[in-house]
From Swiss-Prot:
Residues binding ATP, per UniProt: S30, G31, G32, Q33, D34, S35
NCBIfam families, sorted: lysidine_TilS_N
Domains (record comment): The N-terminal region contains the highly conserved SGGXDS motif, predicted to be a P-loop motif involved in ATP binding.
Catalytically driven reaction(s): cytidine(34) in tRNA(Ile2) + L-lysine + ATP = lysidine(34) in tRNA(Ile2) + AMP + diphosphate + H(+)
Known function: Ligates lysine onto the cytidine present at position 34 of the AUA codon-specific tRNA(Ile) that contains the anticodon CAU, in an ATP-dependent manner. Cytidine is converted to lysidine, thus changing the amino acid specificity of the tRNA from methionine to isoleucine.
Keywords: ATP-binding, Cytoplasm, Ligase, Nucleotide-binding, tRNA processing
Species of the source: Thermosynechococcus vestitus (strain NIES-2133 / IAM M-273 / BP-1)
Stated name of the protein: tRNA(Ile)-lysidine synthase
Length: 344
């Protein structure tokens, strides 16, 4: 098979070199329209690129039909002569975030076990637009809006998302045009999930009343922000050694004042990420920025973990809470207490 989407993906891969000639590639295959579309495209392009392709299916065990879904994927892979691994979750993931984290752990471990250099997922332009909106509505930084990068590292493996140039409507049309079987996941229509409500209600509303090409517009915004993020990350990596002190942890507030506001915030964020496991937000970053111009001895309110930041000369130092005193050691029952001293 060869059509317009084959040609576009072939051209994109030649330009970007995301999946080099002869790569061994692990395909995340859920059985839905997006992953079936991606798998068929890669199989059709395989003779041109000499890839070695294998698939993995993650069974979260959330749904009563999850075993039937896994069997469907295995049968489809067998029909297409595609080796396929099915991995079932040992425990039911409690949240969507936990499920996502488990999936990516599976992708990395299976890729390593099968000597794959790349993992591909079937995220589309529609997914990228939805992710940007979700992050925006929740509240995030510009970096948080630069969502679903086309390529990033997954440990020693490279994760690639080749379908970010296609919408979900286009993957559906592709599957229909080529008569490809797809698994219908009923949970995709459950409005208890925020992403489903956004996909089924908000995006169509925006398309009807504001911009029929809103998915493309939002995805382009994410792409622009991604290039900005790459630039700022490189700048922060270059400048951090001139601003951050490791022992004891501190920020050089005089040096920090020399930089534009965008770099100040990112350098502070870089510092705090090294020392805070949670609770990093806009309010905390602005509280640290306020210490750039306050008097000696000024300090922030308590941060997560009981830590706080305090001005000491030119430095904004991280102050950790004092460890509790060690518990007294009980006397050995076998030992006798010394006799009391005589009173004189």
């Amino acid at each position: 098979m060869w059509g317009i989407h084959h040609a576009r993906l072939h051209t994109t891969l030649k330009t970007q070199q995301w999946l080099p000639l002869g790569s061994r590639i692990l395909i995340a295959l859920s059985g839905g329209q997006d992953s079936v579309c991606l798998t068929r495209l890669l199989l059709d392009l395989q003779p041109h690129w000499q890839w070695s392709l294998v698939a993995v299916h993650c069974d979260h065990r959330w749904r009563a039909d999850s075993t039937a879904n896994a069997n469907f994927v295995q049968q489809l892979a067998q029909k297409w002569h595609l080796p396929c691994e099915v991995v079932s979750a040992p425990d039911l993931p409690k949240t969507e975030a936990a499920a996502r984290s488990w999936r990516y752990q599976v992708f990395e471990s299976v890729a390593k076990a099968l000597d794959c250099t790349h993992v591909v997922t079937a995220h589309t332009q529609s997914d990228r637009a939805e992710s940007l909106l979700l992050h925006l509505l929740r509240g995030t930084s510009p970096d948080g809006l630069a969502t679903l990068l086309p390529s990033r590292s997954l440990g020693a493996i490279q994760l690639v998302r080749p379908l970010l140039g296609m919408t979900r409507a286009q993957t559906a049309a592709f599957c229909q045009a080529y008569g490809l079987p797809i698994w219908q996941d009923e949970t995709n229509h459950n409005l208890e999930y925020r992403r489903n409500r956004l996909r089924l209600e908000l995006i169509p509303y925006l398309q009807q009343h504001f911009n029929p090409n809103v998915e493309e517009a939002l995805a382009q915004t994410a792409e622009l922000l991604a290039s900005d993020r790459a630039y700022f990350e490189a700048e922060v990596e270059r400048l951090a050694p001139t601003v951050l002190r490791e022992h004891p942890p501190a920020l050089d507030r005089l040096r920090l004042r020399e930089f534009p506001l965008a770099l100040q915030r990112r350098l502070i964020q870089c510092f705090l990420r090294q020392h805070l496991k949670r609770g990093l937000n806009f309010r905390v970053i602005e509280a640290v920025r306020a210490l750039m111009t306050t008097g000696n001895g000024s300090q922030t309110a308590s941060l997560p973990g009981g830590q706080h930041l305090r001005v000491c000369g030119r430095w904004i130092e991280l102050v950790r809470p004092m460890p509790p005193p060690p518990a007294p050691v009980p006397p050995d029952p076998g030992e006798r207490s010394p006799p009391p001293s005589p009173l004189y």
